[in-house]
Curated annotation (Swiss-Prot):
Keyword Zinc-finger (UniProt): no
Organism from which the protein derives: Pyrobaculum aerophilum (strain ATCC 51768 / DSM 7523 / JCM 9630 / CIP 104966 / NBRC 100827 / IM2)
InterPro entries reported in the protein's UniProt record: Pep_tRNA_hydro_II_dom_sf, Pept_tRNA_hydro_arch, PTH2
Gene: pth
Protein name per its UniProtKB record: Peptidyl-tRNA hydrolase
Pfam families the UniProt entry points to: PTH2
């Protein structure tokens, strides 16, 4: 069983590469912290850490799409987190920017984000 993490950044936001990278980082940290507190998720986290921490950054359409992905991940029992921007640089406070799913088995993560395109 392979495990991975996917991060989806909103494609409708016009943000800098640095901002997108920061939001992806926030998303990854939030999911790792969540996974540390759950026995099943912790197994996936430990495997993910041992195997190179595979991450894939994808594009979500908009805020509504982020929340749809988040609900799907929760319904499958996967670690997930939505990042809400603090509004200190490029975006208004409270703007949802990204979602993370995993680390979890590839086939489960793909049920949530498998149809998304790579972030550019």
């Amino acid at each position: 069983m392979d495990v991975k993490m996917t991060i989806a950044i909103r494609g409708d936001l016009k943000i800098s590469c640095g901002k997108a990278a920061a939001q992806a980082g926030h998303a990854a940290v939030e999911c790792v912290l969540a996974a540390m507190g759950d026995a099943k998720w912790r197994k996936w986290l430990d495997q993910w850490l041992e195997e190179g921490q595979k991450k894939i950054v994808l594009t979500a359409d908009d805020a509504a799409h982020l929340y749809q992905l988040h609900e799907r991940a929760k319904s499958l029992g996967l670690p997930t987190a939505v990042v809400i921007d603090a509004g200190l640089t490029e975006l208004p406070p409270g703007t949802p920017t990204a979602i993370c799913v995993g680390p979890a088995p590839d086939e489960l993560v793909d049920k949530v984000t498998g149809s998304l395109k790579l972030y550019k």
